[in-house]
Amino acid sequence: MKPVILATASALLLAACQTNSYDSLAYGPTLTPVGQGLEAGRMPVPQPFQQAKERTFRSAYNLNSQSMYRALRAAAVGDVIRITIDIDDKAQLDNNTNRSRKSASDVGFASALNLSGFQSGSTSGSASGNLGLTGDTSTDGKGKIDRSEKLRLSLAAVVTEVMPNGNLVINGSQEILVNYEVRVLTLGGIVNPLDVTSNNTVAYDKVAEARISYAGRGRLNDVQQPAWGQRLFDAVNPM
């Protein structure tokens, strides 16, 4: 009976260690459904109902289309805007901390004691002592950061909300599957319509509350990540 219980417990433990589903292990990662990136991260402001404009009789111009006198810039919910990402950052930090502290204390005392009643007559005695305390603490710390980041991409995002002051809330995502590895690029933020160029493009550094994510998922990413048991052990290990 004990071998059966041991085998069952081992099987359950191995099943718990599995972080991916069978489909993911057999066929690799899958792409998210189209349109999932259009979901805004917060509740949008209700948009007023717009009555569709009717076409003028025997007119070659459709009033429902884009205006011939207006720049083709994103301005309404559902419009597409192009975001250019050109990051070339470099940071170097070098910190050094050294702290030392010493303390010493010396206390002496002397006292005369008179004892009587134990024997005939009286006896006298004396006591003396010396108490010394010393302490020494020191701290030495050093830290250095040297990092460089380069990222040059472009992404088409969709306007998911028009704020009361006219700013545009955008959200976009892009996924590419190559050799069972998915490259995922997501971007979200708030754009001022005045920063949109005539070709309907805005730079990433003009996007307020920008959230840019460039990551991946798949078999290669799973191998690079430590197992969840190791991460749990590192979280509770005090040493």
Swiss-Prot record:
A lipid is attached at C17 (N-palmitoyl cysteine). A lipid is attached at C17 (S-diacylglycerol cysteine). It is found in: Cell outer membrane; Bacterial flagellum basal body. InterPro entries: Flag_Lring. Residues 120-138 have a biased composition (Polar residues). Residues 120-145 are annotated as: Disordered. Residues 1-16 form the signal peptide. It is a lipid-anchor. One of its GO terms (molecular function) is cytoskeletal motor activity. GO terms for cellular component: bacterial-type flagellum basal body, distal rod, L ring; cell outer membrane. Pfam families: FlgH. Assembles around the rod to form the L-ring and probably protects the motor/basal body from shearing forces during rotation. Belongs to the FlgH family. This is Flagellar L-ring protein. It comes from Azorhizobium caulinodans (strain ATCC 43989 / DSM 5975 / JCM 20966 / LMG 6465 / NBRC 14845 / NCIMB 13405 / ORS 571).
